[in-house]
Design a protein with these regions (language model features):
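Rossmann-like adenosine-cofactor binding region
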Residues: 209-291
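Short glycine-/small-residue-rich Rossmann-like dinucleotide-binding loops
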Residues: 69, 75-76, 95-96, 221, ...
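Adenosine-phosphate binding glycine-rich loop
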Residues: 118-159, 269, 274-364
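Glycine/serine-rich phosphate-binding loop and adjoining beta1-alpha1 elements at the start
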Residues: 2, 8, 77-169, 298-300
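An N-terminal-biased, well-structured beta-alpha scaffold segment characteristic
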Residues: 2-106, 110
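Glycine-rich phosphate/diphosphate-binding loop of Rossmann-like nucleotide-binding domains
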Residues: 6-45, 152-240, 287
Length: 364
């Protein structure tokens, strides 16, 4: 199979979808790998490393899309890439369709096969291609939130860990999955007073048993969230419904319960966001203020640490890339029901239920 690796062009997206080591594995199996010039440079991989692995370098993104049977990316195609995706081409990347009608419509019109990292499942229903980036995003959410709590950044001027004789800052984590777990661990490690809220009692029980002593658990409801907000400095939104839009757990009206200068970090923004007042931001302009509350809503948080996140991502994706290249998408999906769940749009038709539910009016 001919595999194309374009350079990511989303704002400050520094990851790359395939390392030279991954390219070497594919070439060894008889596949042809084309990599766009400097695609890996921000992750620490020069063109020469890909060439040494047996890949070929192409000068432009148009060249890569034009020749490849399978495009492997990190983030969804942006508007300038829509015309490059063609009928019958397999595109394997994070799509997050449910929060982006324009992208969904463009991929329907392209006639391509869209296989989404975020809905591929393991037999136990965990999400193997979402987990590594959720780990990174969860940890970074606290790192970034702590930074914007600083007064020069517009925050209230709180040090999350406190100091002897001064209370630590308070962090509320909404969602106890992979993102929430990692966010709570990071916040706890800084010495913050952490509360993690979730709807699953078994999950809360597990977290209560395994988390550090400065992490408390809370059954999530509008009432319990409202009770927590007046004393909270940093809120991490970490809810996930696979493939679907995130629910709004904090409304505009609830912002008045927070003290001015508090920070909301919405890790669920790539699925539409879990705060009513959220809209996507970029690493170049990461925050905005509504009702004196800072909102950090960067949709590609791990893109800021590519030398960590590229390796974490490609460790997980490479076995699937090899399977798709070796068997073709139809045979590979037939043999692996978990991979088949990654199919979101196939040749003009929405095939993933949560995406179809998000856009009932879209027709092929």
């Amino acid at each position: 199979m001919i595999i194309g690796i374009p350079k990511e062009i989303k704002n400050n997206e520094n990851r790359v979808a395939l390392t030279p080591a991954g390219a070497k594995e594919l070439v060894k199996r008889g596949h042809t790998v084309y990599v766009q010039h400097t695609a890996g440079i921000n992750s620490g991989f020069a063109d020469d490393a890909y060439v040494a692995a047996g890949a070929r370098i192409l000068p432009s993104i148009e060249d890569v899309y034009g020749i490849a049977e399978m495009i492997v990316k990190v983030k969804e195609p942006i508007a300038s890439e829509y015309p490059l995706v063609r009928k019958g081409q397999l595109v394997f990347t994070y799509f997050h369709f449910a929060s982006d009608e324009a992208l969904t419509l463009a991929m329907i019109k392209s006639g391509s096969i869209c296989l989404a990292y975020e809905t591929v499942e393991n037999p136990d229903h965990t999400l193997p291609l979402l987990i590594p980036m959720s780990e990174v995003a969860g940890r970074m959410s606290v790192q970034e939130g702590a930074r914007f709590l600083e007064k020069p950044q517009g925050g209230k001027g709180v040090l999350l860990g406190g100091v002897p004789g001064v209370k630590p800052g308070k962090v509320l984590v909404l969602g106890g999955g992979v993102v929430g777990h990692n966010a709570a661990l990071m916040a706890a490690g800084l010495g913050a007073d952490v509360t993690i809220a979730d709807l699953s009692l078994p999950r809360l029980r597990y977290l209560s048993e395994t988390m550090p002593k400065n992490v408390k658990t809370l059954f999530s409801s509008t009432h319990t969230i409202e009770q927590e907000l007046p004393t909270t400095d940093l809120v991490i939104g970490a809810v996930l419904i696979p493939g679907a839009k995130a629910p709004h757990l904090i409304t505009r009206d609830m912002l008045k319960l927070l003290k001015p200068g508090s920070v909301l970090v919405d890790v669920a923004i790539d699925q539409g966001g879990c705060f009513e007042t959220s809209h996507p931001t970029t690493h170049a302009n990461p925050v905005y203020e509504i009702d004196d509350i800072l909102h950090y809503c960067v949709a590609n948080i791990p893109g800021a640490v590519p030398q960590t996140s590229t390796l974490a991502l490609t460790n997980a994706t490479l076995p699937y890339v090899i399977k798709l290249a070796d068997r073709g998408w139809e045979k590979a999906c037939e043999e692996d029901p978990g991979l088949e769940l990654g199919l979101n749009i196939v040749e003009g038709k929405i095939v993933y239920p949560a995406v179809a539910e998000a856009f009932p009016s879209l027709k092929a």
